[in-house]
């Protein structure tokens, strides 16, 4: 209800900037932003007006905040470069945050063998 009221106020005050409409899509925490000829689905809870990182009107991180969610985002800020965001298994290398994105990029030093899944056959080993 609050989001609908905010959209109505924004459309009345800024009629040419109101190119998006916020819709509630069945689940309380799932929202979509509808642009002309384009629908963007947001992360669960991103449009919750209580979300500390998100401006409920623009659906972007608040001023001074870097991100809303992601493995390299905590408390609305990017994690420091070098922070482990995905631990390697066995001899596999870890993946690290870059400090400039909320995503966890694949470690460029990983070889082809690091891509094997744990479900692959284990020769001479017992997995428990």
UniProtKB/Swiss-Prot annotation:
Disulfide bonds: 53-76, 67-73, 72-97, 85-104
Region of interest (Disordered), ranges: 108-128
Localization of this protein: Secreted
Superkingdom, natural source: Eukaryota
Name of protein: Disintegrin gabonin-1
Function: The heterodimer bitisgabonin-1 is a potent inhibitor of the adhesion of the RGD-dependent integrin alpha-5/beta-1 (ITGA5/ITGB1) to immobilized fibronectin.
Record propeptide residues: 21-47
Complex formation: Heterodimer with bitisgabonin (bitisgabonin-1 is the name of the heterodimer); disulfide-linked.
Organism: Bitis gabonica (Gaboon adder)
């Amino acid at each position: 209800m609050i989001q609908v009221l905010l959209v109505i106020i924004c459309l009345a005050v800024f009629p040419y900037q109101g190119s998006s409409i916020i819709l509630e899509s069945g689940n309380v925490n799932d929202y979509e932003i509808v642009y002309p000829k384009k629908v963007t689905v947001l992360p669960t809870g991103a449009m919750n007006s209580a979300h500390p990182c998100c401006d409920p009107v623009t659906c972007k991180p608040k001023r001074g905040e870097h991100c809303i969610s992601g493995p390299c985002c905590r408390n609305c800020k990017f994690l420091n470069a070098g922070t482990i965001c995905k631990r390697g298994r066995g001899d596999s290398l870890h993946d690290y945050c870059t400090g400039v994105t909320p995503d966890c990029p694949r470690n460029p030093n990983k070889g082809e063998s690091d891509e094997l899944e744990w479900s692959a056959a284990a020769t001479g080993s017992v997995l428990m």
